[in-house]
Amino acid sequence: YWNALKRRKGELSTICRQLKLTASDGKKYMTDVVDDEGVNTIIALIPSKKSLVFEKWLKGMGSSIDDKSKQKAYELFESGMINEIEVGTVKGLQQIHAYIFGGLYDFAGQIRTMNIAKGGFAFAPAMYLQDNLRQIENMPDDTLEQIVDKYVEMNVAHPFMEGNGRSTRIWLDLILKKHIKKFVDWSKIDKKAYLTAMQESPVDSSHIYELIKGALTNDINNREIFMKGIDYSYYYEQVDE
């Protein structure tokens, strides 16, 4: 179908030289991209018995919770609602979580009442969580060291059933922006290094501190850096195959 469209010189695609996918022969090939109109053209070329299946598959793409919540994270910035978020408070973190996961999780913005664990690490017990969150909220956040410590403690608390990392990284950036006039360019922090540092942080936060310090930028109103940061934040949460 791709070749047929190209022969007909339709407005089709560009080569995505940075994105290669594995084909059935086991080799990786550069991919083509089309817009909505191009997709409809492709469907029209497919034999009718198969076109409905293909169309249903296409409509299902981009519909995961991650994709939808990422779009909401973009909108949080684009709409200006991010400027209404309480900075450095539990309520502020709940506001972020409620916005980017609203309509996707029933518990969006709600503090969990159940115990959770990940990778063998148990986060703050639910029965003590409210007290822990009050203590974290009252932690000082005037310097980078203090802000990173507060971020680490909030990660250990993990106040939501799901979506903690994505929400808390935005929360961290707002604190940095308010108190030291910087925020993190997450594209400068390697995924493996970040995840390793966060695993170590309950015992030793020096590694995550150095990663964050090395990725700080003064360009706090740069839309591109923020949007790229959202992409990297969601990338950190993806399970590597």
Language-model segments: what does each one mean?
Residues 1-23:
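Major-groove DNA-recognition helix of helix-turn-helix-type DNA-binding domains
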